A protein has these predicted regions:
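Acidic, metal-coordinating helix/loop segments flanking the phosphotransfer/catalytic sites
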Residues: 30-48
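Receiver (REC) domain active-site loop signature in two-component systems and cognate sites
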Residues: 55
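Conserved acidic carboxylate
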Residues: 8
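C-terminal output helix
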Residues: 106-115
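Charged docking surfaces used in two-component/phosphorelay signaling
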Residues: 15-23
């Protein structure tokens, strides 16, 4: 069973994403800020980390930097969610270490399709 870490500070969106992923039998750990995300990542192996760009404590970019500096992150895929979808922002996201990007707003179905593609090695 695949394990996913979701870090999103918007409660309603976080619950929607968790429900969508858990309905497909993914194990989802959730964090409401970047600090919680880093703590969870240090204590559990994840197949995928989904991060919001703008969060309290640490931004999504800062979380990526922390994750990519650990030995255990080599096989972990990172998906960044952001309303900042200008090309220069996306370039910065990828340069920091994200593997995938999805612009907000998005439908739960589209997110699920992307997550399944990532975890099945199709994307």
């Amino acid at each position: 069973m695949k394990r996913i870490l979701l870090a999103e500070d918007e409660d309603v969106l976080r619950m929607l994403v968790v429900d969508t992923l858990e309905d497909e039998d993914y194990i989802v750990d959730e964090a409401a800020d970047g600090g919680e995300a880093i703590e969870l990542f240090q204590n559990h192996p994840y197949d995928l980390v989904i991060l919001d760009y703008m969060m309290p404590v640490y931004t999504g970019l800062e979380v990526i930097e922390q994750i990519r500096n650990t030995e255990t992150s080599k096989h972990t895929k990172i998906l960044m969610l952001s309303a900042k979808n200008q090309s220069f922002e996306q370039e910065r996201i990828f340069q920091t270490g994200a593997d995938y990007f999805m612009a907000k707003p998005f439908s739960p179905r589209k997110l699920l399709e992307l997550v399944e593609g990532i975890l099945n090695g199709e994307i």
